[in-house]
């Protein structure tokens, strides 16, 4: 069995990943950014807009399990992978989330990201 990917804990690494490739899905947004040979790493962000602590932690547990399962085989080598939870993600079936993450990782490997959203001012 392969080792689990490392966890991103520093804010600077999360901000750097925001400059990388972005792949949006109904349940989450995947960010992928090269990390200068530090191996596969992952981070999870779920904002308070999603729900209370119980709901956010449940979503993070589901994302963590998916990343442990899929990143070693399908993730980008020497990249940081960030999953940002969306409101629809908590109600989605686990199998559906897995399919969406597999598709998002495939699109990231192909370099096919989604356009950035314009910020409201």
UniProtKB/Swiss-Prot annotation:
Gene3D superfamilies, per the entry: 3.30.230.10
Reaction catalysis annotation: Endonucleolytic cleavage of RNA, removing 5'-extranucleotides from tRNA precursor
GO terms of biological process kind: tRNA 5'-leader removal
Keywords linked to the UniProt accession: Endonuclease, Hydrolase, Nuclease, RNA-binding, tRNA processing
Recorded GO MF terms: 3'-tRNA processing endoribonuclease activity; ribonuclease P activity; tRNA binding
Summary of the function given for this chain in its UniProt record: RNaseP catalyzes the removal of the 5'-leader sequence from pre-tRNA to produce the mature 5'-terminus. It can also cleave other RNA substrates such as 4.5S RNA. The protein component plays an auxiliary but essential role in vivo by binding to the 5'-leader sequence and broadening the substrate specificity of the ribozyme.
PANTHER family to which the protein is assigned, alphabetical: RIBONUCLEASE P PROTEIN COMPONENT (PTHR33992:SF1)
Subunit details: Consists of a catalytic RNA component (M1 or rnpB) and a protein subunit.
Protein name per the record: Ribonuclease P protein component
Annotated source species: Erythrobacter litoralis (strain HTCC2594)
